[in-house]
């Protein structure tokens, strides 16, 4: 079975990927701990390509990466590409966003995900982008998910990502939508 390395050290992310790529005949693995990739691109796309390219080079295998984040209208798109570095942990990131939006009526936001797959030769062979629109609520709701999931209410369901079951989240999340776009290509590669 061919290996596909997820260019991430985030255990929550690999669990999400395993569910979404269930029908792809590959062994999905987290990147080795020894690999460090600096996310210094100025776009989500640049960061996704850089991560997949570096991990494919160092593992000599296929690699998949995404760069994703939340962009909040009233904060001029922040945290944006700095979403995972906006504070030291999920709880503090949520607290910071809620503090910065205190008293703000415009709470519109969107999650964005850029997904990239690189071949063992580091060539970009698949990529996609998807967004999910919603609002930042006043206080966290729900027990599931990770990151900003408890404060992001998806527009069509009126549920936070933390309140959604996997089926609902996979169908409407930014990452789920971006991955679905490249699944036909992955099925071909890993057939």
From Swiss-Prot:
Obligatory cofactor(s): Mg(2+)
EC number: 3.6.1.66
Highest taxon listed in the record's lineage: Bacteria
The entry's keywords: Hydrolase, Magnesium, Metal-binding, Nucleotide metabolism, Nucleotide-binding
Catalytic activity field: XTP + H2O = XMP + diphosphate + H(+); dITP + H2O = dIMP + diphosphate + H(+); ITP + H2O = IMP + diphosphate + H(+)
Disulfide pairings: none
Active site: 67
Pfam families: Ham1p_like
Gene3D superfamilies: 3.90.950.10
Record note on cofactor: Binds 1 Mg(2+) ion per subunit.
An annotated GO cellular component: cytosol
Coiled-coil ranges per UniProt: none
Keyword Nucleotide-binding: yes
Binding site for Mg(2+): 38, 67
GO aspect biological process, one term: purine nucleoside triphosphate catabolic process
Keyword Ligase included in the entry's annotation: no
Single Gene Ontology MF annotation: metal ion binding
EC class (word): hydrolase
InterPro entries: dITP/XTP_pyrophosphatase, ITPase-like_fam, RdgB/HAM1
List of residues binding substrate: 8-13, 68, 146-149, 169, 174-175
Subunit structure: Homodimer.
Its job: Pyrophosphatase that catalyzes the hydrolysis of nucleoside triphosphates to their monophosphate derivatives, with a high preference for the non-canonical purine nucleotides XTP (xanthosine triphosphate), dITP (deoxyinosine triphosphate) and ITP. Seems to function as a house-cleaning enzyme that removes non-canonical purine nucleotides from the nucleotide pool, thus preventing their incorporation into DNA/RNA and avoiding chromosomal lesions.
HAMAP family in alphabetical order: Non_canon_purine_NTPase (MF_01405)
Protein family (similarity comment): Belongs to the HAM1 NTPase family.
NCBIfam families (UniProt xref): RdgB/HAM1 family non-canonical purine NTP pyrophosphatase
Protein name: dITP/XTP pyrophosphatase
